[in-house]
C-alpha cells in the first residue's frame, strides 16, 4: 500500500506528478470548502505533508497518528509549531540555499526601485502626468558608491552585499548577533552595532531570521536613527519591523522610502501602505522565479522521500527528532 501524503499548497507540476506516481496523494483544495476541515480529515492517517505558507500547529495536527514529516517548500519555518513537532517526533525539513541568489536579486531590485521611485514614476507616467520635464518630486537617490547596511549577514544577506560591493562600489556595513568574518571576507564589510549601522547607512536591507530576539527589531526608535534620505528594504519576515511605526515614518518623510516583500500579516489585503507613494509593496515573492521554485520543490520532494524511506534528510530544522521511530 502506498504511503499517504498531503499536499497543502500549490507546488511545481512535475513534482506533483512524481508525488502522485509514488504516493497516495491528497491535495487540499480551497475551492472545495474549508481547508482546515479538509486537513483535519486527511491528516489522521497521513504519513507525510509537503507545501508552504500554511500555519501548521497542534490545533490542526492533533489527529495525526502516523505523520513522520512536514516537508516545507521554503527556508523560513515560523508558521510551524516546532515544539509540538518535536513532542510528536515529526521531522520538519526546509529548502535553504537554492533560493539565496534569487532572493538577493529581489532584495536589490527593491533597493533600486525604491531609490529611483520606479513604482511611483510608472504610475505617474501612465496617469498622463508627464507634460514637461521632470521636477524634484520625481527625483530619486543615487546608489553607486553609497553605504549599504545589512541586518543579518547570512547567506542571503551576504549575497545582497556582494551585489552592492561588486556591482555598485558600495561600502558595506553589517550587524549580526555575532561577527561573520567568513561571509564578510572579500567585501570589506565592517561589523557594527545596529544603532551605528542605521545612523551611517544610505540603504538598509533586513535579512534576519524571525525569532524572539528579532521580532520588532526595527521600531520607531530605530527608524528615528536612520538618515532622512535612507531606504529600508525588508526581505526577511514581516514581524521583524513594526509595520505601523514604519507607516508613520514614511508618512512623515522621516526616511526616503521603503521596499517590502513581507508583512506582519499575510496576505496583505488592506493597509495604509497602499496609500503611500514612497513604499513599494510586493506579495512575498522573494524566491518566486520558475527555476528556483522548481528547485525548491524538488529538494522538498527529496526531503520527504528520504524520511518516508527511512533515511535522514539533508535539511532538518529540528534535528532533535533524528533517531526517533514512528
Language-model segments: what does each one mean?
Residues 150-151:
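Conserved N-terminal Rossmann-fold NAD(P)-binding element of oxidoreductases
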Amino acid at each position: 500500500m502506498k504511503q499517504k501524503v498531503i499536499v497543502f499548497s500549490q507546488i511545481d507540476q512535475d513534482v506533483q506528478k512524481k508525488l502522485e506516481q509514488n504516493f497516495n496523494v491528497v491535495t487540499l483544495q480551497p475551492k472545495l470548502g474549508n481547508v482546515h476541515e479538509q486537513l483535519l480529515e486527511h491528516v489522521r492517517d497521513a504519513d507525510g505533508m509537503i507545501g508552504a505558507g500554511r500555519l501548521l500547529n497542534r490545533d490542526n495536527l492533533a489527529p495525526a497518528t502516523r505523520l513522520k514529516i512536514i516537508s516545507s517548500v521554503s527556508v523560513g519555518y515560523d508558521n510551524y509549531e516546532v515544539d509540538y513537532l518535536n513532542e510528536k517526533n515529526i521531522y520538519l525539513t526546509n529548502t535553504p540555499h537554492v533560493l539565496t541568489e534569487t532572493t538577493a536579486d529581489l532584495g536589490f531590485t527593491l533597493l533600486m526601485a525604491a531609490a529611483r521611485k520606479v513604482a511611483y514614476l510608472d504610475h505617474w507616467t501612465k496617469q498622463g502626468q508627464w507634460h514637461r520635464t521632470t521636477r524634484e518630486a520625481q527625483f530619486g537617490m543615487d546608489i553607486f558608491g553609497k553605504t549599504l547596511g545589512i541586518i543579518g549577514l547570512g547567506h542571503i544577506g551576504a549575497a545582497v552585499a556582494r551585489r552592492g560591493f561588486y556591482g555598485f562600489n558600495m561600502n558595506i556595513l553589517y550587524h549580526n548577533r555575532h561577527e561573520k568574518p567568513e561571509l564578510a571576507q572579500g567585501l570589506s564589510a565592517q561589523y557594527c552595532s545596529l544603532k551605528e549601522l542605521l545612523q551611517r547607512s544610505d540603504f538598509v536591507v533586513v535579512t534576519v531570521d524571525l525569532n524572539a530576539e528579532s521580532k520588532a527589531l526595527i521600531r520607531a526608535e530605530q527608524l528615528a536613527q536612520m538618515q532622512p534620505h535612507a531606504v529600508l528594504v525588508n526581505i526577511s519576515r514581516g514581524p521583524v519591523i513594526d509595520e505601523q511605526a514604519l507607516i508613520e515614518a514614511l508618512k512623515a518623510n522621516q526616511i526616503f522610502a521603503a521596499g517590502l516583500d513581507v508583512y506582519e500579516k499575510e496576505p496583505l489585503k488592506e493597509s495604509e501602505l497602499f496609500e503611500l507613494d514612497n513604499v513599494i509593496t510586493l506579495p512575498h515573492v522573494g524566491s518566486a522565479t520558475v527555476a528556483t521554485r522548481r528547485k525548491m520543490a524538488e529538494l522538498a520532494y527529496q526531503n520527504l522521500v528520504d524520511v518516508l524511506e527511512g533515511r535522514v534528510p539533508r535539511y532538518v530544522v529540528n534535528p532533535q527528532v533524528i533517531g526517533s521511530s514512528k
